[in-house]
Amino acid sequence: MKSDSMKEGLARAPHRSLLKSIGYTDEEIGRPIIGIVNSANEIVPGHADLNKIARAVKDGVYMAGGTPVEFSTIGVCDGIAMNHIGMKYSLGSRELIADSVEIMATAHAFDALVMIPNCDKIVPGMLMAAARLNLPTIFISGGPMLAGRYPGKPEKKVDLITVFEAVGAVKSGRMAPEELAIIEDAACPTCGSCSGMFTANSMNCLTEAIGMGLPGNGTVPAVMSERVRMAKQAGMRILDLLKNGVTPDKIMTAKAFRNALAVDMALGCSTNTVLHLPAIAHEAGVSISLDLINEISGIAPHLCSLSPAGPNHIEDLNMAGGIQAVLKELARKSGLIDPDCLTVTGRTVGENIASARDADGQVIRTLETPHHAQGGLAVLFGNLAPDGCVVKQSAVVDKMLVHEGPARVFDSEEDATTAIMDGRIKKGDVLVIRYEGPKGGPGMREMLTPTSALAGMGLDSTVALITDGRFSGGSRGAAIGHVSPEAMEGGPIAVVKEGDTITIDIPKKKIGLKLDAGEIQNRLSGWNRPAPKITRGYMARYADQVSSANTGAIFKK
């Protein structure tokens, strides 16, 4: 066992003495040492109840003959960090989480790991660490929040995005402040990751699809006892993975990532998956290009219309059979799902889905009756984004799939939000929010406040928003992010001027600035890089090390 290097033999008497000071017995020290990576805290709704999950995991580890040793990681709530300086720190926390798990697991010679994440950057950060460390690892997430119900109208579901969009509705006079207060109180009724197909749930579902979580990991609600039982099963299962030498490199293969991308497209997941899956794959020695994402989107249909794109929530997907049912439906089409990929169950994808439910035709549509023939995400290229940009095409109204309009240019999210709230944005406009990329932000903030304000004001069907920042999984409309190269790196987005004509053609995967190449080059030759917005601390170091969004915003070294 790896832990023998820190606990066995004469020279390790001091180490054993330290373990005994905590209360571990010789019997416990002699067992496999299983690191329990618990990201619980009291500020993130999806992490507020993770101590209960950790206790269940430890029970499972003990039942299977291991010794669980718990340690913590940080975790940021993107919703609470939204639209202020805090959002600059969210994406950067992904790398910090991966590094901290690597440090703890290596320094203490753990034999295997059980990861307990739930929300946006914690899930990919832990997956990156799992791939890097390549110790036997299993994931058990905290589970999704239940959707809220509008008081007096139990058939009307509400969620966090309902609140964000209601702010814009109040500002435009379309909703009374009293109704906003009612929605605010009703939208988030339980702990858990926010209830739609937003970033956290996207990543939890893809963790299951790629094989690193047990069936149900992505969809069983946080408040259900099934989640606790699953945690115990994960604790027991990790000892089997250790015994059989099943490490992440045997699960997170190139074929498994293709499976995850197919599920991504079927679910209509967050655009943030285009950052996270390549970053995780990079740690696993697998390459995921933007062209591959378009390739799979072209053949994997959009089967589930989940909030913010549709009326259903993760609890509905769970009741319809969850990720295993989605995998089973996709597997009916040759080339979409590789059934031979290994999972943490010890069985293959094909063996797991053999007992899964069939698509119900409503929450999970069949291949013959998809919401859209293509997948939920699309990557666009053109002279405005030579290295690509990303849109959740499943959340764009039909008439905005092709659009041309004048650029309304802003150098920060705050300036753009003020313009929207002040009524200065008109139908047909194309908002350009720049210097919000990985380096320029720094940290590539999510533009959920401006997209929600547009939706709340009824402008999401007539106004596009383009940014080198990114979007929450809760954003909808023609919200095009991850423009690469970013403005801070001298990308063409840096020299867009107020009133320039921008063309968008999502079906053709094109985005352009109606200027000839010579004019764009002339403007770029006169461009000067602005001073960094943060000059000390972690995010200053992050801005120096981070790469472009088109490669997953990973560190260069």
Curated annotation (Swiss-Prot):
Positions bound to Mg(2+): D78, D120, K121, E446
Record keyword Ribosomal protein present: no
Catalytic activity reported: (2R)-2,3-dihydroxy-3-methylbutanoate = 3-methyl-2-oxobutanoate + H2O; (2R,3R)-2,3-dihydroxy-3-methylpentanoate = (S)-3-methyl-2-oxopentanoate + H2O
Essential cofactor(s): [2Fe-2S] cluster; Mg(2+)
Keywords on record: 2Fe-2S, Amino-acid biosynthesis, Branched-chain amino acid biosynthesis, Iron, Iron-sulfur, Lyase, Magnesium, Metal-binding
Pathway as given in its UniProt record: Amino-acid biosynthesis; L-isoleucine biosynthesis; L-isoleucine from 2-oxobutanoate: step 3/4; Amino-acid biosynthesis; L-valine biosynthesis; L-valine from pyruvate: step 3/4
Gene3D superfamilies given in the database record: IlvD/EDD C-terminal domain-like (3.50.30.80)
Keyword Magnesium on entry: yes
Domain of life assignment: Bacteria
Any one Gene Ontology BP term: L-valine biosynthetic process
Active site: S472
Residues modified to N6-carboxylysine: K121
Binding site for [2Fe-2S] cluster: C119, C194
Gene Ontology MF: a single term: dihydroxy-acid dehydratase activity
Task of the protein: Functions in the biosynthesis of branched-chain amino acids. Catalyzes the dehydration of (2R,3R)-2,3-dihydroxy-3-methylpentanoate (2,3-dihydroxy-3-methylvalerate) into 2-oxo-3-methylpentanoate (2-oxo-3-methylvalerate) and of (2R)-2,3-dihydroxy-3-methylbutanoate (2,3-dihydroxyisovalerate) into 2-oxo-3-methylbutanoate (2-oxoisovalerate), the penultimate precursor to L-isoleucine and L-valine, respectively.
Name of the featured protein: Dihydroxy-acid dehydratase
